[in-house]
């Protein structure tokens, strides 16, 4: 009976000691920093793009950044041009009128 009591207490201690000393679990997964060094070794190095490759172009092979700068300069650095802004305001008015008519 005493032998079973000692084994009952000894087996968990031995397995816990083995897990901590080897740093591995039953399936071979690591508990220590080995896993983190492996993942950093697998990370790809960043690709350095040239300035021309980094910029996107549209269907006509024109630089989108340059086109956007021209558009903003033409609009006076506003988010929308005057025409787009007036169309947006008209749509808002129509929506408000429709809501008022639906409530009545």
Curated annotation (Swiss-Prot):
Tissue expression as described in the entry: Expressed by the venom duct.
Keywords (A to Z) from UniProt: Calcium, Disulfide bond, Gamma-carboxyglutamic acid, Ion channel impairing toxin, Ionotropic glutamate receptor inhibitor, Magnesium, Metal-binding, Neurotoxin, Postsynaptic neurotoxin, Secreted, Signal, Toxin
KW Secreted (keyword) present: yes
Disulfide cross-links: 91-104
Location(s), subcellular: Secreted
Signal peptide positions on this chain: 1-26
Region (Disordered) residue spans: 29-87
Pro-sequence residue ranges: 27-80
Modification sites for 4-carboxyglutamate: 83-84, 90, 94, 103
Name of one Pfam family that matches: Toxin_36
Domain remarks in the Swiss-Prot or TrEMBL record: The cysteine framework is C-C.
Miscellaneous comment in the UniProt entry for this protein: Adopts an alpha-helical conformation in presence and in absence of divalent cations. Calcium facilitates disulfide bond formation of the synthetic peptide.
Protein name: Conantokin-P
Taxonomic source organism: Conus purpurascens (Purple cone)
Lineage of the species this protein comes from: Eukaryota, Metazoa, Spiralia, Lophotrochozoa, Mollusca
């Amino acid at each position: 009976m005493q032998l079973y009591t000692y084994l009952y207490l000894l087996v968990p201690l031995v397995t816990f000691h083995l897990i901590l000393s080897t740093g591995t679990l039953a399936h071979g997964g690591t508990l220590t920093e080995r896993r983190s060094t492996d993942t950093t070794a697998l990370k790809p190095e960043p690709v350095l793009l040239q300035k021309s490759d980094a910029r996107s172009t549209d269907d006509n092979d024109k630089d989108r950044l340059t086109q956007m700068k021209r558009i903003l300069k033409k609009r006076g650095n506003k988010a929308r041009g005057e025409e787009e802004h007036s169309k947006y305001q008209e749509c808002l008015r129509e929506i408000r009128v429709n809501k008022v008519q639906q409530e009545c």
